[in-house]
Amino acid sequence: MVEDPGAHCSSVRIVAVNDDDEIGELGARGERILGVALVSPFRDRPAYATTVENSVYVARAARGRGVGEALLRQLMTVAGESGFHSLIARIVGENASSIRLHEKCGFTLVGTEIEVGRKQGVWLDVVEYQYVMSTHSR
């Protein structure tokens, strides 16, 4: 286990690249990026150093192909190996595909933040999902 995994938080990033066809976003080196999964600090205080917030982004053209699940599962593995104890996902409540993805990967709904965001004049709720490494076996 890493003594202070939070110090290495920004280094946990997984990128899916496609060499076979034109699907994905064009990357800086000409590669086709299908998606990205990463972690960021959950809180700045040392007591929360082993908890991180995850984000998964999949190119529109690559959705529905298992890219998000592959990215998230690999991110979970790397985060666990890096010494993180808990992953948090904050998802806009209407993003059903991200909610399904996190539930499929073993995340549990732990709360809802009411009207914490605003987009195009509409208030948005955010649901919070959590995955605790020690209570799951992959």
Show which residues each predicted segment covers.
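Acetyl-CoA-dependent GNAT
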Residues: 1-61, 72, 132-136
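Alpha-helix termination/capping residues and helix-transition junctions
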Residues: 31, 81, 121-123
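Conserved catalytic-core motifs of GNAT/GCN5-like acyltransferases
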Residues: 38, 88-91, 103, 108-125, ...
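Residue-level preference for beta-strand/loop junctions
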Residues: 50, 83, 123-125
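A structural signal for short, well-ordered beta-strand segments
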Residues: 54, 87-89, 129
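Conserved acetyl-CoA-binding loop-helix of GNAT-fold acetyltransferases
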Residues: 58, 64-81, 86, 96-104
